[in-house]
Amino acid sequence: MTITLIFLLVIFVLALIFVPFTRQLVKDKEELSRNPINKKFEILVGVINDIMLDGKGEITLFDDDPRLMNLMSEDKRNMLIQFHYSTGNLTIILNYKFLQKELVYKKQFSGLRNLSVFMQRDIANEFIEICNKKIAEHQQNVGYMDMSSMSGAHCQGLSESD
């Protein structure tokens, strides 16, 4: 009797978790069939493209996953920006390579089912600001590590402020 109650309780809890999540995924599918990810976030992607890729980025959509989109540029091959939309949340991932060291930065934005133009601009600007800081830190750290690994007189007197 006790095992049956525990089993039913576990099934009930799993249903409470699984059913709303599944409904959100169905909403995503319906929403993205009417309004693909590149159209839904057109302003946001445009601002990121203009500032981070000098307006030369190209969008890549995936037939097998309409929730995923990449933004990259031939001019800046060391940078890839991925967008993943799921359950009303947008995750933007920056992949940036500098001197063979990769920076991966991920930021999630929630509650974006009904997104205004102003919200898209704000999200894009927030992401760009954070990424610019992360890229500068990465370049400084990788550049400093690269210089500090060199031997001989070239490294004498080198400090983090240089």
Regions found by a protein language model. Name each.
Residues 21-91, 98-103:
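N-terminal topogenic membrane-targeting module
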Residues 1-34:
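N-terminal signal-anchor transmembrane alpha helix of single-pass membrane proteins
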Residues 89-162:
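Cytosol-/stroma-facing membrane-proximal "stalk/adaptor" domains immediately downstream
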Residues 5-6, 40-41, 150:
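Intrinsic low-complexity, intrinsically disordered segments enriched in polar/basic residues
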Residues 2-3, 33, 51, 113-119:
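General structural signal for secondary-structure boundaries
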